[in-house]
C-alpha cells in the first residue's frame, strides 16, 4: 500500500485572508495573526508591570547603563573584600585647551629672622612668571562689508607681558526697508524744478539728470547699445489719419483659398437675394420670423429651425421672412465696395406634400454695415505745462518803500470831509419826450409821421437813408363783429293758429322732375 504524500500547508497570512470572511479559520492561525498567543499575552501584560528603563538598554550610548557590563568569564558569585570593579568601554578623550605645560619653580622658605615687610621695588624670590610668553592673536575678517586692518601691538617690558588689541569693529548689520504705496488715480503730484545735477523723483518715475559729462573708468567698452530717447509725460505724437482697414491683421494669404462646397450666396439664379434693414437681424433674427419675448442675455449664433402648423396661418413680424423654416448662422464677408456684410442663408417651406415633404426656395438675407470714417485727429492742449525754470520774485528787492508818518498831518485842518451819499444819483427817469427809432439797413421806405397833440413843441428826426418809423394815429375804427346764424333748419309753429295748417320747410317740399310724364 502506497503512503499518501503529505501536502505542505499554506502560509498563515494567506489562510487568514481567505477564511476570515467565511469564519472558518483555525484557532492557531487567528492567534498568530492577531498576536493573541500565550507568549504575546505574557509580553503584553508583563511589560505593564515591569519597567526596564533604568538599565540603559537601547539608549545608544554604549556605556552599559548605571551598573556597567559584567565580564562573561566571571560567574555570578560574590566578591569578598572590596567593591566590585565596574568595567566600561574605553572612550578616547578629546583634548581641550593648551597642550603645553609651563614649569613653575618652587619657592624657598622664608627665614624666621627676616622682616615681614616686603618692599615693592625689590624682589627677594624667584619670578613666578616666565620671561616671555608668545601670544598669537588671530582675527578673522568679516565677509560682509569692507575689510578693516586691525593692528596687534605687543609690548614686552622686563618680565611682564602687555597685550594691546584694538577693539574689534562692529560687523555691518543688514537692514530691510519695506515700502507700501497705495495708488490713488484722482491724486497726482506734479513737481517741476530747474534741471540740475542730481536725482529727483516724480510720482513713480525716477529721473536722473546730469549737467556735466561723464568719465569712463576701466577698459574700453567693446559693445555699444544704441539707446532711444524716452518721451516725457507732456509730449504727444500727432498721428496721421490712416485709411480704414478691412481686417485687424491685413496679411495676404500664402495660398489661395479653395473653392467652397455648396451653393454660393450671391448666385441670383439659385438663391433669392433679400436685403434686411431691421437691426434685429444682427442680434435676434428669430423675432423677425415669429413673435417672441426679448431675452437680452441670449445671442443667437446658431442655426434656427422654425416649425409651422399646416392648418394655421401665422403672419410674421417682417413680411420678408414669410414661411421661413430654417435660418442659418451668421456669415461675414466683404462687399466689393469695402463694407462688411452679415449674411444668413434661409429656407422657405412654401409647399407641403401629402407625404410630409416640404418644398421651398433658398433665400439669402443680408445687411451691409455702414463704414466708420476716420476723422481728423484733434489737437489737444497741454494741461499744467511747465517750462522747467523756476521764477523767484523777491518783493523787498523789486519794491519801493516810502516812510510816511500818518500821525502828524499838517493838512488835516483844511480838509473838509463829505459823505458818500452825495455821489448817489437821485434823478428819476420818466422818459418824457423820448423818441423810438427802429432802424433797418435793407429798406429805405419813407413813412408819414403825424403830429401828436401835445402842449410842448416836439422835434422829430427823420433818417434819409434807412430805418423804420412807428406812428400812432389819434382815432381808431373798431369793426363790429357779426356772428353767423346756425345752419340747422328752423321750423316755425304758430300756437295761436287753430286752423290746423302748418308751414312746410322748403327742404321738405317735393321736387319736380326735369321732364314731365308722357
Curated annotation (Swiss-Prot):
Q: What range does the record give for the signal peptide?
A: none
Residue segments, region Disordered: 235-261
A molecular-function term among this protein's GO annotations: structural molecule activity
Disulphide linkage map: 19-25
Instruction: Enumerate the UniProt keywords alphabetically.
Output: Capsid protein, Cytoplasmic inwards viral transport, Disulfide bond, DNA-binding, Host endosome, Host Golgi apparatus, Host nucleus, Host-virus interaction, Late protein, Microtubular inwards viral transport, Phosphoprotein, Viral penetration into host nucleus, Virion, Virus entry into host cell
Q: How is it modified after translation?
A: Highly phosphorylated.
Which GO BP annotation is one of this protein's? microtubule-dependent intracellular transport of viral material towards nucleus
User: Function, please?
Assistant: Minor protein of the capsid that localizes along the inner surface of the virion, within the central cavities beneath the L1 pentamers. Plays a role in capsid stabilization through interaction with the major capsid protein L1. Once the virion enters the host cell, L2 escorts the genomic DNA into the nucleus by promoting escape from the endosomal compartments and traffic through the host Golgi network.
Per the record, the similarity remark reads:
Belongs to the papillomaviridae L2 protein family.
User: Partners and quaternary state?
Assistant: Interacts with major capsid protein L1. Interacts with E2; this interaction inhibits E2 transcriptional activity but not the DNA replication function E2. Interacts with host GADD45GIP1. Interacts with host HSPA8; this interaction is required for L2 nuclear translocation. Interacts with host importins KPNB2 and KPNB3. Forms a complex with importin alpha2-beta1 heterodimers via interaction with the importin alpha2 adapter. Interacts with host DYNLT1; this interaction is essential for virus intracellular transport during entry.
Name under which the protein is recorded: Minor capsid protein L2
Organism of origin: Human papillomavirus 36
Amino acid at each position: 500500500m502506497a503512503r499518501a504524500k503529505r501536502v505542505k500547508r499554506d502560509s498563515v497570512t494567506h489562510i487568514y485572508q481567505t477564511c476570515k470572511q467565511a469564519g472558518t479559520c483555525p484557532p492557531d492561525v487567528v492567534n498568530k495573526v492577531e498576536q493573541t498567543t500565550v507568549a504575546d499575552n505574557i509580553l503584553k501584560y508583563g511589560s505593564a508591570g515591569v519597567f526596564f528603563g533604568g538599565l540603559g538598554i537601547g539608549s545608544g550610548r554604549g556605556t552599559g547603563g548605571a551598573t556597567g557590563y559584567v565580564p562573561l568569564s566571571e560567574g555570578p558569585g560574590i566578591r569578598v573584600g572590596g567593591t566590585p570593579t565596574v568595567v566600561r568601554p574605553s572612550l578616547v578623550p578629546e583634548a581641550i585647551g593648551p597642550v603645553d605645560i609651563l614649569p613653575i619653580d618652587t619657592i624657598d622658605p622664608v627665614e624666621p629672622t627676616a622682616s615681614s615687610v616686603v618692599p615693592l621695588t625689590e624682589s627677594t624670590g624667584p619670578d613666578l612668571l616666565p620671561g616671555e610668553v608668545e601670544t598669537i592673536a588671530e582675527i578673522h575678517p568679516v565677509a560682509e562689508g569692507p575689510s578693516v586692518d586691525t593692528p596687534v601691538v605687543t609690548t614686552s617690558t622686563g618680565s611682564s607681558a602687555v597685550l594691546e588689541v584694538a577693539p574689534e569693529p562692529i560687523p555691518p548689520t543688514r537692514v530691510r526697508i519695506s515700502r507700501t504705496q497705495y495708488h490713488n488715480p484722482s491724486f497726482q503730484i506734479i513737481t517741476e524744478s530747474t534741471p540740475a545735477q542730481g536725482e529727483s523723483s516724480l510720482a513713480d518715475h525716477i529721473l536722473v539728470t546730469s549737467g556735466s559729462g561723464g568719465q569712463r573708468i576701466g577698459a574700453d567698452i567693446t559693445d555699444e547699445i544704441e539707446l532711444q530717447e524716452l518721451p516725457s509725460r507732456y509730449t504727444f505724437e500727432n498721428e496721421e489719419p490712416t485709411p480704414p482697414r478691412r481686417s485687424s491683421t491685413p496679411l495676404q494669404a500664402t495660398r489661395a483659398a479653395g473653392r467652397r462646397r455648396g451653393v454660393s450666396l450671391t448666385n441670383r439664379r439659385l438663391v433669392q437675394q433679400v436685403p434686411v434693414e431691421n437691426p434685429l437681424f444682427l442680434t435676434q433674427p428669430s423675432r423677425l420670423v415669429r413673435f417672441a419675448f426679448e431675452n437680452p442675455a441670449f445671442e443667437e449664433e446658431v442655426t434656427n429651425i422654425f416649425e409651422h402648423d399646416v392648418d394655421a396661418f401665422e403672419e410674421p413680424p417682417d413680411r420678408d421672412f414669410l414661411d421661413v423654416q430654417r435660418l442659418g448662422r451668421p456669415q461675414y464677408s466683404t462687399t466689393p465696395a469695402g463694407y462688411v456684410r452679415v449674411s444668413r442663408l434661409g429656407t422657405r417651406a412654401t409647399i407641403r406634400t401629402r407625404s410630409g415633404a416640404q418644398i421651398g426656395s433658398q433665400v439669402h438675407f443680408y445687411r451691409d454695415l455702414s463704414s466708420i470714417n476716420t476723422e481728423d485727429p484733434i489737437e489737444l492742449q497741454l494741461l499744467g505745462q511747465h517750462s522747467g525754470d523756476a521764477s523767484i520774485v523777491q518783493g523787498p528787492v523789486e519794491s519801493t518803500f516810502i516812510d510816511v508818518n500818518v500821525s502828524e498831518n499838517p493838512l488835516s485842518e483844511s480838509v473838509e470831509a463829505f459823505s458818500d451819499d452825495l455821489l448817489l444819483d437821485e434823478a428819476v427817469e420818466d422818459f418824457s419826450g423820448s423818441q423810438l427809432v427802429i432802424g433797418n439797413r435793407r429798406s429805405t421806405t419813407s413813412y408819414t409821421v403825424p403830429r401828436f397833440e401835445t402842449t410842448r413843441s416836439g422835434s422829430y428826426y427823420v433818417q434819409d437813408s434807412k430805418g423804420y418809423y412807428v406812428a400812432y394815429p389819434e382815432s381808431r375804427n373798431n369793426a363790429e363783429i357779426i356772428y353767423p346764424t346756425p345752419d340747422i333748419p328752423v321750423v316755425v309753429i304758430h300756437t295761436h293758429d287753430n286752423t290746423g295748417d302748418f308751414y312746410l320747410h322748403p327742404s321738405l317740399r317735393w321736387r319736380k322732375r326735369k321732364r314731365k310724364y308722357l
